[in-house]
A protein has these predicted regions:
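C-terminal catalytic histidine-bearing segment of alpha/beta-hydrolase fold enzymes
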Residues: 188-240
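Flexible "cap/lid" loop of the alpha/beta hydrolase fold
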Residues: 75-81, 155-174
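Hydrolases whose catalytic domains are alpha/beta-hydrolase-1, hotdog thioesterase
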Residues: 135-139, 161
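Catalytic nucleophile serine of serine hydrolases
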Residues: 40, 130, 154
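Gly/Ala-rich beta-loop-alpha elbow adjacent to hydrolase catalytic centers
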Residues: 127-132, 136
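A conserved short beta-strand
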Residues: 145-158
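Serine-hydrolase catalytic machinery in alpha/beta-hydrolase-like enzymes
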Residues: 10-122
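Short beta-strand/loop motif that positions the catalytic acidic residue
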Residues: 175-178, 182
Length: 240
């Protein structure tokens, strides 16, 4: 039998429609901070942005872009996919470089759109949760976006990034937040990541809270510089 012929893979750009979930003031003149927040694997933006009520005090425009790839939850039997949960993913290992490029263009468009709506040059915070932390850090590392604060929650910066003094990331204040009961981030992994960031002399802070793989109101408020959780108790310090 003849050897099977491998197909040629040809790539080209196509138009996609993306969506964002937004919370914060409708009056753009009231916006004092712009937050771009990236959800984790299997989440949707509309659900994810619901976790930011603790800092939604009328001064922040909180924009959650949704990753451009969606899927049915694999735990749901195929026959019942109509009722299955839907999630989104920033990338997979398939066509990795192209997916990273596509997500960067999408995020740049989101930022440009909401920057144009806000009155004045307000500070930008970029937060990535879980898989979104890698997407957020890769985006900032490309340059072209200069947030006042990069927050990686439930994960750290993408491992391949340049953390050197002249790199775009070096000019960004960075905070890594991890729950002490996060089943996806072990103490050993945290130690390795601390050593990597320290070896690169990369300026960063680590925050911990008594919880799992999720956002935490008091910690979010503290990292955001909010003295009191909106509608709740003071943002008291978590674990050292």
């Amino acid at each position: 039998m003849p050897e099977p012929i491998e197909p040629r893979i040809e790539r080209f750009s196509t138009r996609r429609t993306g969506r964002c979930a937004v919370r914060g003031p409708e009056d753009m003149a009231a916006v004092q901070e712009l937050w771009i927040v990236l959800h984790g694997y299997g989440q949707l933006a509309s659900r994810f942005v619901g976790g930011f009520g603790a800092i939604d005090d009328g001064s922040r425009l909180i924009v959650a872009p949704e990753a451009l790839s969606r899927f049915y939850d694999a735990r749901t039997p195929l026959a019942s996919h109509i009722a299955a949960e839907v999630g989104a993913s920033w990338m997979t290992r398939e066509d990795r470089a192209d997916e990273i490029e596509d997500q960067a263009h999408w995020l740049a468009q989101v930022l440009e759109t909401y920057r144009a709506r806000v009155a004045g040059d307000v500070p930008l915070t970029v937060l990535g949760f879980s898989q979104g932390a890698a997407a957020a850090s890769r985006w900032v590392a490309r340059g072209g976006v200069a947030p006042a604060h990069l927050i990686c929650w439930g994960a750290s910066l993408a491992p391949e990034l340049d953390l050197g003094a002249g790199a775009p990331l070096a000019a960004t204040r960075c905070t890594v937040v991890v729950g002490e009961r996060d089943v996806f981030v072990s103490a050993a992994q945290i130690a390795v990541e601390r050593a990597r960031l320290d070896a690169a002399r990369f300026t960063h802070a680590f925050e911990h809270f008594a919880g799992g793989h999720r956002l935490d109101d008091a910690t979010l408020a503290r990292v955001a510089g909010v003295a009191r959780v909106v509608g709740g108790a003071p943002a008291t310090p978590a674990f050292p």
